Amino acid sequence: MDYLYSALTSKMNWIALLLAGLTFCCKVSVHSCLDYDDSYDYYEEEKTETIDYKDPCKAAVFWGDIALDDEDLKMFHIDGTIDLKQQTHGRQGHTSGGLGEHVPTKKRGSLYLLLDRIRRLGFESWPVNSSKDVSSIKTGIRRVNSARNVKSRVPRAATSRAEKIWPGGVIPYVIGGNFTGSQRAMLKQAMRHWEKQTCVTFIEKTDEESYIVFTYRPCGCCSYVGRRGNGPQAISIGKNCDKFGIVVHELGHVIGFWHEHTRPDRDDHVTIIRDNIQPGQEYNFIKMEPGDVNSLGEPYDFDSIMHYARNTFSRGMFLDTILPSRDENGVRPAIGQRTRLSKGDISQAKKLYRCPACGETLQDSVGNFSSPGYPNGYPSYTHCVWRISVTPGEKIVLNFTTMDLYKSSLCWYDYIEVRDGYWRKAPLLGRFCGDKIPEVLVSTDSRMWIEFRSSSNWVGKGFAAVYEAICGGEISKDSGQIQSPNYPDDYRPSKECVWRITVSEGYSVGLSFQVFEIERHDSCAYDYLEVRDGLSENSPLIGRFCGYDKPEDIRSTSNNLWMKFVSDGTVNKAGFAANFFKEEDECLKPDNGGCEQRCVNTLGSFKCACDPGYELAPDKKSCEAACGGLLTKLNGTITTPGWPKEYPPNKNCVWQVVAPTQYRISMQFEAFELEGNEVCKYDYVEVRSGLSSDSKLHGKYCGTEVPEVITSQYNNMRIEFKSDNTVSKKGFKAHFFSDKDECSKDNGGCQHECINTIGSYVCQCRNGFILHENKHDCKEAECEHKIHSTTGTISSPNWPDKYPSRKECTWDITATPGHRVKISFNEFEIEQHQECAYDHLEAFDGDSDKTPILSRLCGNKIPEPLISTGNKMYLRFISDASVQRKGFQATHSTECGGRLKAEARQKNLYSHAQFGDNNYPGHTDCEWLIVAESGYGIELTFTTFEVEEEADCGYDYIELYDGYDTGAHKIGRFCGSGPREELYSAGDAVLIHFHSDDTISKKGFHIRYTSTKFQEALHTRK
């Protein structure tokens, strides 16, 4: 009995150690935890998601970023000794354990309550902060198992439970509605990365019962291991988890992988430094038993994307918890990379899903493949599978160029099967053998499956095939996807794709965009997507779209829709992704959709609405008296229901303010507090010019920032307030007042432009003119301009009309120190001359016409952009007495980087042009080369330094090199608060490289630099 008590005590100790993950699981940060909010608002998650999925954030236990449910706990024999259900004490985030994902100290939580409960059950022998070795804890487990005569079963490096494997390696998925276009593209890139390297296939969910849901959850980065079955399961890509490598890691769990460092042979390869582990996180470093783990014959993989980093769950950012052993060269391998799948990851996944020994996933738009050994014969008993996956909306054209297989009746022995889809159960396009080359095969969608088997000893050449993805074509089905060529990567140049979509008779075609990013142009002249209401290019035009704003949902009037995508040969963007489906107008039914007042048809559904002064009742069909109404006073006050107390949930208030003709209405908010942030997805107020819900939108507002004064374009204004069913705030109080628009009659008497103001108006002159003393007329202005703004437009005098004769204009443009001036011409038409001797525009590389000339321009051809070498540029336009033309219009902006000269006087360098006003932009790569005179070095002083922090400075950083290029001695890579002291070069040049990624941005940096006499060696001043 004493032995059993001891064994149970040991088991409970191990259970408590494992369950240290209860609300103790790590808070996530992408290379920095600075922006992770401990008081996470649950309602900032994806509220609109209606899928009842298996939520990893509600797991019984967490093991790092792995969610364990009751079924998983049985694997640990945690099955009834005590009630181990999770007790929530605050919301926690999780980390994938990758390189640079620092985890701060954890708060006390339910672990301590659990230990209390263990003690109350009579297990008093283990103190809370026990340093008992993990292996001894496991000894207790083995004793319990032995006593029960039950074979121990614990998680493996790759799951060994057949029900956790996705059948056929096919994983259906849904991407939740809260992700941006760039995040959606990144999620698809991560899935395509797994597809490219293995035989796992991700497909958009159709009618599958089990599938994964990408969602934004409060537990950060978190997932179950393998397939849960019996419905959807979530993979949480929460705050700061939207990095390619982190998503690849989390997908590794979905596919069926545990963490690499839990293997039984890990002590031969790494050392766990227990003293550096955060209290309560020891369970994350439990090692499995040799008899229980099957790593599928793969050696220990330091490079695995499933391996923890050296400092995961460390007490301090620079303290190791996992120390890799040195290799034969005495070097410790890097661990914890979150960049791509390792060779070991790929090999293990192929074994787990029993991928055929030959074949691959082909994702390029063109490609080729052939049988093993081609053209020298293929071996017997061979099995190969090729999966071709191109962009949805494209079709695959497969052409066999050679065919020499053993011929048999019904191609029974050696054969090739081609299927129209993503797997072996897709419709068969053909089964081939012998030496007759098949006809060209064309898929109906964007995937094709090619399987080759040989079972004879006959030796033939084999086969060879080429394929090509073609965009556009006839699409006759009720739902599907269309994406720009090469999505989620940038679309290809010089493409033209035409799709003709037909759905069932009696329906219209609905088109909804998830992602849209096409080269921007005012008239969409370069790259664009054109949509027409019919089947031909002569059908009525619905719209021609470009830029970065997603088009509104589109509905055709018939069961046909025509789409054309065009890209030119220059700028390429991310493109678009859209879903199409058959659409029915439920509002045309005799019962008006069951709505009491108004029925509003929406894509895929409908909704009821009410007349002004009414709102929907809880049944969402009938209407009842509401807030809002028609207001005809010249001034008044509007407040949310219940003001100044919190507004109620599920409210929809519409105020329609109408003023006399020639009046404009202004709205000024006195107080403002609504749920939400910049997204305004939950509670919000919309202000529009006009009375309808689709009139011009001035803004959609939420949060606590008081909006600026809003003035209508017409004599009416619509204000709509909506609240959802959860969080309520104080609301808003606003005053409206009407003002006569003097500009609406005779342009206010202004010669050029009339600008209406509250209570009055002002006249304004076009470019090249100034206002006359009478405040209405315009006269020709002096033409000297000093420009200090980071961006703007400049143009010739009198633009867009012809410039005057005998005119001289100058522009003295100054950019932020460390940034160069860039001039990009939008239009250009100046009198032509071979040497530009008459009318011309000159650009000088400095602050006057005494500096080096960059260019002298005339004619009708738009010049290439002009870029200064320093932070100043001087432009001079001169016209003579004869011919006048339209002139020019150009945009001035800034370019970072360049060559800078260090002198005795101190100079400045800023990280970005809008330093002090805005954080630095994303996707930045800038290089500055600072050069001193021969015999002098360079002193750098960082007066401000605030760059996204991360242990290895992997995301945003500044690199310094003691020389002219990156081959020189590297002084260091800095992020966070940067170097604390002055830096000196050992030579006469310093190269500065600044990089930022596409997520978190900070204030940036300000460097003062000067030349100084050489120091004996590179050093910092203490």
Swiss-Prot record:
Active-site residues, Swiss-Prot/TrEMBL: 250
GO molecular function list: calcium ion binding; metalloendopeptidase activity; metallopeptidase activity; peptidase activity; zinc ion binding
Any one annotated GO CC term: extracellular region
Disulfide bond annotation, renumbered to this chain: 199-355, 219-241, 221-222, 358-384, 411-433, 471-497, 524-546, 587-599, 595-608, 610-623, 627-653, 680-702, 743-754, 750-763, 765-778, 783-809, 836-858, 896-926, 953-975
Peptidase M12A domain residues: 157-356
Biological process, per Gene Ontology: blood vessel development; determination of ventral identity; dorsal/ventral pattern formation; embryonic caudal fin morphogenesis; embryonic hemopoiesis; endothelial cell development; mesoderm formation; positive regulation of BMP signaling pathway
Propeptide residue span(s): 33-156
Tissue-level expression: During gastrulation, accumulates around the closing blastopore with greater expression ventrally. At the animal pole, expressed in the ectoderm flanking the anterior neural plate. At the 10-somite stage, expressed in the developing tailbud and cranial neural crest. At the 20-somite stage, also expressed in the hematopoietic system.
Signal peptide boundaries: 1-32
Enzyme class, spelled out: hydrolase
Domain EGF-like per the UniProt entry, residue ranges: 583-624, 739-779
SUPFAM superfamilies in alphabetical order: EGF/Laminin, Metalloproteases ('zincins'), catalytic domain, Spermadhesin, CUB domain
Enzyme Commission number(s) of this protein: 3.4.24.-
Residue ranges of domain CUB in the record: 358-470, 471-583, 627-739, 783-895, 896-1012
UniProt keyword Hydrolase, yes or no: yes
Glycan attachment positions: 129, 178, 368, 399, 635
Keyword match Signal: yes
Cofactor: Zn(2+)
Keywords for this protein: Calcium, Developmental protein, Disulfide bond, EGF-like domain, Glycoprotein, Hydrolase, Metal-binding, Metalloprotease, Protease, Repeat, Signal, Zinc, Zymogen
Protein name: Dorsal-ventral patterning tolloid-like protein 1
Organism field: Danio rerio (Zebrafish)
